[in-house]
């Protein structure tokens, strides 16, 4: 009984209108009010951008790119080399030149 009532109330608008829903090319002729098509274009494009953004974020989370994979098993640092000497002796730095520069006295090298 409930199903029959639901179907009846769903079909009342179809019977009451003069539109032929089985002919979609004539469906816009049922309405006399002018439609602002640019609003529909903006709405549809905004909806497509939103849906594609949601789908792309869902796909990005599910795909295993190399920068998203679990990387704890990789070494963080290279293994230290055991054959390096612990005391590294650097050579003596060269002596400063014995010539005195003119610019050191006057401060004009800035």
Curated annotation (Swiss-Prot):
One of its GO terms (cellular component) is host cell membrane. The keyword Transmembrane helix applies. Keywords: Early protein, Glycoprotein, Host membrane, Membrane, Phosphoprotein, Signal, Transmembrane, Transmembrane helix. The chain crosses the membrane at residues 37-57. It is a single-pass membrane protein. Phosphorylated on serine; O-glycosylated, but not N-glycosylated. Residues 1-16 form the signal peptide. One of its GO terms (biological process) is regulation of signal transduction. It is found in: Host membrane. InterPro entries: Adeno_E3_14_5. Belongs to the adenoviridae E3_14 family. Down-regulates the EGF receptor and prevents cytolysis by TNF. This is Early E3B 12.7 kDa protein. It comes from Human adenovirus A serotype 12 (HAdV-12). The lineage of its organism: Viruses, Varidnaviria, Bamfordvirae, Preplasmiviricota, Tectiliviricetes.
């Amino acid at each position: 009984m409930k199903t029959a009532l639901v179907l009846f109330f769903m079909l009342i608008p179809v019977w009451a209108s003069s539109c032929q829903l089985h002919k979609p090319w004539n469906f816009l002729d049922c309405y006399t009010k002018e439609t602002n098509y640019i609003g529909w274009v903006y709405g549809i494009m905004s909806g497509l951008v939103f849906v594609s953004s949601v789908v792309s974020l869902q796909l990005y989370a599910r795909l295993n790119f190399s920068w998203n994979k679990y990387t704890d098993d990789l070494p963080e640092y290279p293994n230290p080399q055991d054959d390096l000497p612990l005391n590294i002796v650097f050579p003596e730095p060269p002596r400063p030149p014995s010539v005195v520069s003119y610019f050191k006295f006057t401060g004009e090298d800035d």
